[in-house]
């Protein structure tokens, strides 16, 4: 065998072996956790899982905190990065958070599922391997640890607690949080209250087919039951019940961008980023210039949401909307029954939300998924009727969801009944439905993350210009949908443009090639060796021009805050064979 042939064969073999090693599964150095994803976990259990992942994968997983909650609980931050392919800030980043609202719990399990899936599938699934090799992931699995702890540890409803634990005088009587829900029968769940009254004094009657349910009487009919709301009594003697529970500060209405006060939007804090939970996220995000995409998990309704959340937020640039549409439309296919929607246009007005803040301040393509919709529409007419919910309870959960009515003494109402659906019904799937929801939404995040900028030096061309001058044309390609600088980032100058640096020779001129055929170039006036590039659009190329004086070779370094780093050495020669620059 000729020496040249042998050398070539060895190079091919070395490249093959290196590729195999790079794709080897991650070998844990400790015992990795094995969570089951057909159940929910309280705050302490989630923290233990995260610590176990960090111990099992110490080179890949870093567990820190981004701050403390209102009551002093840690807000965990999980960073997943392949150290063999570079430091985290040199790669595009995907941010994922969950459980912003206390009662919207299963987003945390979805985040755990995604974390577990990536770590255990690296080296086994090509798409997972490629993604973890070129991107970094940041997870905040529990944005509201105080609220999660209360939802799991105290009597709750499907809708309460929702807020952070900031005391608030909701009824403006000078006291804070003094009249919340009360577990009248001591069963650990807040259900409904109903009272039998003399015929004609009520607006409801028992359903003749199922006395567990009440039906509203029609005009001319007389009822003998009243519905009295959630379990509770008049704690403060003001004649009202449950009017001032845990202070209503909605963390997803307290971010910095498009903040509006409480007289405009219920749930607002006194000023932007007042509460430690959202302030911690906003402050941390400022330290991550590589943040290019974001995903928040909420519930419920099966929706894939993006901003703008209100008319105060300008309409997103068309180029960015195209990226949003591409990702969300694929999401509708990955998530049967989910619908892509614009918050302020298709749903409701919402100010100072996570998605608007991360997009309008950081230029990150951001979604909120509203997880799950109870599959209780058994006849497929688009409406889940009370009798269908009860049938689902009886036949599919064998009665688990509905708490039977029980007589209790009420300090204001006298003898009443308490009963109804448990706090984990309606917004949260049963365990046998949870894992499927986790997987499909994790797959959506991975698809979203797959669209993070993937830059490469597609082509270079060197031509002698005489007298030691060389013209260098470089084409930077983006193989994915998200640009290395979103349109909103360019429009509002949210962060530094991409930077192309040439060293090793004197740079006489540089610029962006606008028309290759006509050789139209937008020249940069100052410091041509540091060419500012307004990003590379998704599935496009950006063509750069340099005129240098020197000999030997130069080094081209392309630095993109959202798209990572590229570096190439370019010889100042005109080779006899070179791919034509197009």
Mark where each language-model region is:
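Bacterial N-terminal signal peptides
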Residues: 7-16
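C-terminal beta-sandwich/jelly-roll accessory domains of carbohydrate-active enzymes
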Residues: 477-582
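Short glycine- and acidic-rich boundary segments immediately preceding or forming the N-terminal edge
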Residues: 23-74
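Bacterial N-terminal signal peptides that target proteins for export
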Residues: 1-7
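Acidic carboxylate motifs that coordinate Ca2+ or other divalent cations, activating on Asp/Glu
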Residues: 169-173, 187, 234-238, 381
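Short helix-loop-beta-strand segments that form the rim/entrance of peptidase-like active sites
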Residues: 107-153
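Boundary at the C-terminal end of the N-terminal hydrophobic targeting segment
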Residues: 17-22
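Metallocarboxypeptidase
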Residues: 62, 74, 138-140, 146, ...
């Amino acid at each position: 065998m000729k020496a040249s042939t042998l050398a070539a064969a060895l190079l091919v073999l070395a490249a093959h072996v290196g590729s195999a090693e790079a794709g080897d599964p991650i070998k844990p150095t400790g015992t990795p956790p094995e969570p089951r994803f057909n159940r929910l976990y309280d705050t302490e259990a989630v923290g233990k899982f995260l610590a176990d992942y960090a111990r099992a994968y110490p080179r890949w997983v870093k567990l820190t905190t981004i701050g403390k909650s209102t009551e002093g609980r840690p807000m965990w931050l999980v960073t997943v990065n392949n150290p063999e392919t570079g430091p985290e800030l040199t790669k595009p980043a995907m941010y994922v958070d969950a459980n912003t609202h206390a009662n919207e719990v299963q987003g945390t399990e979805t985040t755990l599922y995604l974390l577990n899936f990536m770590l255990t599938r690296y080296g086994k699934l090509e798409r997972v391997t490629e993604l973890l090799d070129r991107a970094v992931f940041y997870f905040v699995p529990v944005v509201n640890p105080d609220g999660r702890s209360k939802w799991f540890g105290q009597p709750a409803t499907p809708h309460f607690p929702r807020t952070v634990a900031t005391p608030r005088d909701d009824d403006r009587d000078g006291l804070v949080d003094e009249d919340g829900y009360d577990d009248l029968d001591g069963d650990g769940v807040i259900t409904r209250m109903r009272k039998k009254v003399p015929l004609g004094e009520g607006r409801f009657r028992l359903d003749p087919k199922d006395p567990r349910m009440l039906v509203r009487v029609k005009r001319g009919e007389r009822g003998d039951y009243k519905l009295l709301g959630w379990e509770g009594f008049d704690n403060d003697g003001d004649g009202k019940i449950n009017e001032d529970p845990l202070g209503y500060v909605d963390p997803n209405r307290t971010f910095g961008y498009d903040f509006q006060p409480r007289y405009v939007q219920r749930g607002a804090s006194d000023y932007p980023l007042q509460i430690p939970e959202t302030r911690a996220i906003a402050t941390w995000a400022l330290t991550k210039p590589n943040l290019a995409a974001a995903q928040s998990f909420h519930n419920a309704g099966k929706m894939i949401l993006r901003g703008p959340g209100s008319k105060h937020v300008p309409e997103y640039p068309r180029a960015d909307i195209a990226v949003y549409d591409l990702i969300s439309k694929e999401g509708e296919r990955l998530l049967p029954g989910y619908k892509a929607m614009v918050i302020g246009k298709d749903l409701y007005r919402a100010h100072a939300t996570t998605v608007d803040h991360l997009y309008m301040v950081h230029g990150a393509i951001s979604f909120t998924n509203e997880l799950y919709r109870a599959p209780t529409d058994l006849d497929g007419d688009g409406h889940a009727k009370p009798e269908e919910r009860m049938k689902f309870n009886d036949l599919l959960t064998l009665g688990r969801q509905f708490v039977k009515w029980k007589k209790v003494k009420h300090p204001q109402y006298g003898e009443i009944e308490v009963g109804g659906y448990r706090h984990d019904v309606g917004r949260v799937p049963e365990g046998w439905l949870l894992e499927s929801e986790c997987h499909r939404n994790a797959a959506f995040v991975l698809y979203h993350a797959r669209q993070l900028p993937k830059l490469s030096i597609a082509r270079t061309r060197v031509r002698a210009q005489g007298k030691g001058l060389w013209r260098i044309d470089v084409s930077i390609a983006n193989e994915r949908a998200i640009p290395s600088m979103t349109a909103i980032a360019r429009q509002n100058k949210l962060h530094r443009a991409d930077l192309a640096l040439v060293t090793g020779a004197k740079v006489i001129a540089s610029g962006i090639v606008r028309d290759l055929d006509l050789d139209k170039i937008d020249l940069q006036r100052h410091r041509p060796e540091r060419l500012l590039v307004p990003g590379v659009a998704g599935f496009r190329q950006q063509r750069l021009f340099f005129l240098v004086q020197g000999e030997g070779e130069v080094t081209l370094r392309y630095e993109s805050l959202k798209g990572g780093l590229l570096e190439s050495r370019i010889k100042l020669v005109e080779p006899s064979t070179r791919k034509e620059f197009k």
